[in-house]
Design a protein with these regions (language model features):
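Catalytic cores of nucleic-acid ligases and guanylyltransferases
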Residues: 1-167
Length: 167
């Protein structure tokens, strides 16, 4: 999560850890966005030469300075609580906030369709996608309207499976 308010910018993990100092490029980008205050949902990523996120790299401190913020939802904007707004409304506001060249922050692309994009993401080597039902409201945690679909061939997914099964 990235929060900007009168106190400044903070990057907070889903477990409440403050990673602001770890990702200076993302902090600088969030500082430059055209709003007084906001809370956006996103993830710090490091990309490879093809522009794909490589989640193993983010675990290494030496890559923290290279990390960018992948923004995928907007929760608050200039005092307006958007959690009860449908995903389409939040995405439109997020696009307006993040559009333009902002090194250090990228907008997660939004696709509408029947799921074919999952197969494309898998072929590209992506870890997976999150499918959000049109009209869904913002909820923290898991939801029946938001599904994380993992690519079983992705290295990060295989590593998670090995850790879960103790291999």
């Amino acid at each position: 999560m990235a929060r900007r308010d009168a106190a400044g910018v903070r990057l907070i993990t889903r477990h409440g850890n403050d990673f602001t100092a770890r990702f200076p490029l993302a902090v600088e980008a969030v500082t430059r966005l055209p709003a007084n205050s906001f809370l956006l949902d996103g993830e710090a990523i490091v990309t490879n030469e093809r522009g794909l996120a490589v989640f193993d790299l983010i675990r290494h401190k030496r890559h923290g300075a290279d990390a960018v913020l992948l923004a995928f939802d907007l929760i608050e904007l200039d005092g307006e609580d958007l959690r009860r707004s449908p995903i389409e409304h939040r995405k439109r506001k997020l696009v307006k906030l993040v559009r333009g060249p902002h090194p250090g922050i990228v907008l997660n692309e939004h696709y509408e369709g029947d799921g074919a994009i999952v197969f494309i993401a898998c072929k590209l080597g992506c870890e997976g996608i999150v499918s959000k039902r049109l009209g869904s409201l913002y909820r923290s945690g898991r939801s029946q309207h938001w599904l994380k679909i993992k690519n079983p061939a992705a290295p990060a997914v295989n590593r998670e499976a090995e850790e879960d099964w103790g291999r």
